[in-house]
């Protein structure tokens, strides 16, 4: 794509170019370290850095143009410069244009919410595949082409930057995908990482307090997540979430779901939690049928209803949904059972890292635990929502018999400060059934070693993440492998 064509795609005035400067643009990035020959470099003014400071570095790496919101007084660009109203929006729009708008060639389902979006994304992908649609997936765990092989992005985020999103969607199309499911975080929606994606279906799970360090207020957090519903042609809405009332009627079409409310379009009846998983009756526009889902946790009924509603909108039948649920094997790091021997406690790895999700996880495991319930839990450092640290300590000590408080990506926040806050949440309620062990590996060892057969140990917060971030280092991490190593020593 020529630079003049890119300007036209962004609805910008034609740049002053000649045959030499109207060069071919082959990619776009906002990171000068990622520039390849032929790239357009988007200079974004952020809280800490101004991308315009890296224009010469981008030029040296082979960039052919710069896009930005305007040069400062006295500043010049070493490359042709396109002035845009919003640099992040331009990054996304340019990425979509250069990739040929791949989402227009796919049926795209977006899933957002504080909790439940990863399980719902994986389940929706599985249901669509069970219905015969070659389906890709882009989620916090990684991304999949229709071949089912899980690939990972080399970063610690839920949704990659806009160029990676568009390139991945193009890769899916090239691999024969007919549909894809994309997990959309509030950061991705706020920072325009998923701008330029053509959404067929938006799935809303629920909203609770998280990432307020970034969004400032819960209302702002909601407003960013709401963007997905505003941009979709069809919405799948959870009527058990109070925020849903503000989402009704926004999308051209919608349906509702609930594990509790019998007035929802998609609803569950006669829910049973068995050793083999969940059994319930589905009442829906697709018909009424008996469902079996081999997953732990009553809350997964709502995730299943959301996935079924989305898949049905894209053509899945009741029989296909029923078969798809029965064959679903869950998500790595989401209520994942770590294999152990007959004399070992049951060890579960789960991503639960907010007070509501931790409460759900512990409540679920309590119902099927004959002995004591243990939890290993930390809270993220940096500026990331310090307000949930004390509530996490309160929930952990209220619902578990033994709580081990530890690290979880403390970054540049002193670990002891985080532990003190979590301990405060427990002590203010008069509880002392906890111990603080700063090193997460040692915390896991302590819990798994001290737990007895019949006990359950929940390793909460990390799930499938493959790094552990500390102030001065980032360690490779595998929570399941850590648990297996301790179980093997018993």
Swiss-Prot record:
It comes from the Bacteria. The modification N6-carboxylysine is found at residue 225. The keyword Protein transport does not apply. It is found in: Cytoplasm. GO terms for molecular function: acid-amino acid ligase activity; ATP binding; magnesium ion binding. UDP-N-acetyl-alpha-D-muramoyl-L-alanyl-D-glutamate binds at residues 158-159, 185, 193. Pfam families: Mur_ligase (PF01225), Mur_ligase_C (PF02875), Mur_ligase_M (PF08245). Keywords: ATP-binding, Cell cycle, Cell division, Cell shape, Cell wall biogenesis/degradation, Cytoplasm, Ligase, Nucleotide-binding, Peptidoglycan synthesis. SUPFAM superfamilies: MurD-like peptide ligases, catalytic domain, MurD-like peptide ligases, peptide-binding domain, MurE/MurF N-terminal domain. Carboxylation is probably crucial for Mg(2+) binding and, consequently, for the gamma-phosphate positioning of ATP. InterPro entries: Mur-like_cat_sf, Mur_ligase_C, Mur_ligase_C_dom_sf, Mur_ligase_cen, Mur_ligase_N, MurE/MurF_N, UDP-N-AcMur-Glu-dNH2Pim_ligase. GO terms for biological process: cell division; cell wall organization; peptidoglycan biosynthetic process; regulation of cell shape. Its EC number is 6.3.2.-. Catalyzes the addition of an amino acid to the nucleotide precursor UDP-N-acetylmuramoyl-L-alanyl-D-glutamate (UMAG) in the biosynthesis of bacterial cell-wall peptidoglycan. Belongs to the MurCDEF family. MurE subfamily. This is UDP-N-acetylmuramyl-tripeptide synthetase. The lineage of its organism: Bacteria, Thermotogati, Deinococcota, Deinococci, Deinococcales.
């Amino acid at each position: 794509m020529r630079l003049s064509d890119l300007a036209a795609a962004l609805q910008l005035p034609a740049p002053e170019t000649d045959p030499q400067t109207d060069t071919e643009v082959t990619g776009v990035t906002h990171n000068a370290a990622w520039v390849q020959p032929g790239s357009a470099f988007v200079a974004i003014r952020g809280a800490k850095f101004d991308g315009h400071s890296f224009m010469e570095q981008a030029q040296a790496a082979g960039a052919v143009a710069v896009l930005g919101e305007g040069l400062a007084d006295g500043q010049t660009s070493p490359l042709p410069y396109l002035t845009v109203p919003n640099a992040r929006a331009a990054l996304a729009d340019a990425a979509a244009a250069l990739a040929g708008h791949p989402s227009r060639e796919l049926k795209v389902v977006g899933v957002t919410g504080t909790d439940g979006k990863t399980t719902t994304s994986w389940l929706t992908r599985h249901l669509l595949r069970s219905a015969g649609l070659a389906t890709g997936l882009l989620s916090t765990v990684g991304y999949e082409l229709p071949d089912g092989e899980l690939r990972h992005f080399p970063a610690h985020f839920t949704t990659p930057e806009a160029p990676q999103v568009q390139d991945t969607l193009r890769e899916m199309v090239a691999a024969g995908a007919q549909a894809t499911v994309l997990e959309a975080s509030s950061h991705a929606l706020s920072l325009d990482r998923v701008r330029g994606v053509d959404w067929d279906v938006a799935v809303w799970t629920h909203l609770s307090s998280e990432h307020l360090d970034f969004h400032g207020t819960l209302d702002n957090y909601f407003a960013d997540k709401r963007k997905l519903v505003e941009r979709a042609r069809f919405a799948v809405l959870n009527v058990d979430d109070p925020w849903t009332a503000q989402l009704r009627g926004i999308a051209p079409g919608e349906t509702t779901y609930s594990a509790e409310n019998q007035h929802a379009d998609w609803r569950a009846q006669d829910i049973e939690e068995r050793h083999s998983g969940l059994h319930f009756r589905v009442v829906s526009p697709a018909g009424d049928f008996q469902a079996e889902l081999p997953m732990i946790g009553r809350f997964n009924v709502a995730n299943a209803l959301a996935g079924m509603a989305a898949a049905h909108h894209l053509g899945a039948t009741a029989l296909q949904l029923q078969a798809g649920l029965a064959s679903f094997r869950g998500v790595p790091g989401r209520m994942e059972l770590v294999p152990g021997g007959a004399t070992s406690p049951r060890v579960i790895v789960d991503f639960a890292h907010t007070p509501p999700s931790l409460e759900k996880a512990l409540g679920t495991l309590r119902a099927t635990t004959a002995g004591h319930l243990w939890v290993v839990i930390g809270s993220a450092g940096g500026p990331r929502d310090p307000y949930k640290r004390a509530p996490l300590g309160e929930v952990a000590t209220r619902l578990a018999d033994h709580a081990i408080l530890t690290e979880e990506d403390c970054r540049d926040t002193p670990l002891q400060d985080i532990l003190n806050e979590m301990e405060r949440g427990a002590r203010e309620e008069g509880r002392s059934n906890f111990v603080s062990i700063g090193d997460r590996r040692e915390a896991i060892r302590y819990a798994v070693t001290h737990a007895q057969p019949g006990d359950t140990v929940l390793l909460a917060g990390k799930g499938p993440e493959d790094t552990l971030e500390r102030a001065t280092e980032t360690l490779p991490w595998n929570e399941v492998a850590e648990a297996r190593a301790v179980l093997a020593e018993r």
